[in-house]
Amino acid sequence: FTHDNQIVGHTTRFLDDRTPKYIQDIQPGYVFGTDLQRNNWQSVIVVEGVFDALSVNGVAVLHADINDAQVRLIRSLEREIVVVPDQDVPGMRLVERAVELGWSVSMPEWPAGIKDVNDAVICMGRLATLLTIMQSRETSRIKIELRKKALVKRIRT
């Protein structure tokens, strides 16, 4: 990983069924993809994983938790922040933090089997995925909580 043309860490992904799937060595507060954001974009899509970020020109926090340094870095982009969590239980922690921060949250109702942004792009294409993300974004705490409850129910069944 790089930031301001400096190497700040790396990640390794195992292709078999090992746990954990990833081993990362990164500086605390790093957000993947901030260097790739364009000044004329009105929003930034915040996701958990690198492949998700690459799929939609977003930024990745590299897990389901956002620390204060990452919050400052994302806010420094000075645009609408749209958080798209993985559609799993850990992703719901990201939703809770986004609500605390007053950020928009998008939890599209994608077809069964799609658990993250990259899966959606593979299944539906980039444009359709971006459209569903932007159409599903929400700022109302109540609507976000209702959508989160419905998603958790779907995850558990």
Which sequence ranges carry the predicted segments?
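Replication-associated primase and helicase/ATPase modules
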Residues: 1-4, 44-46, 72-85, 92-157
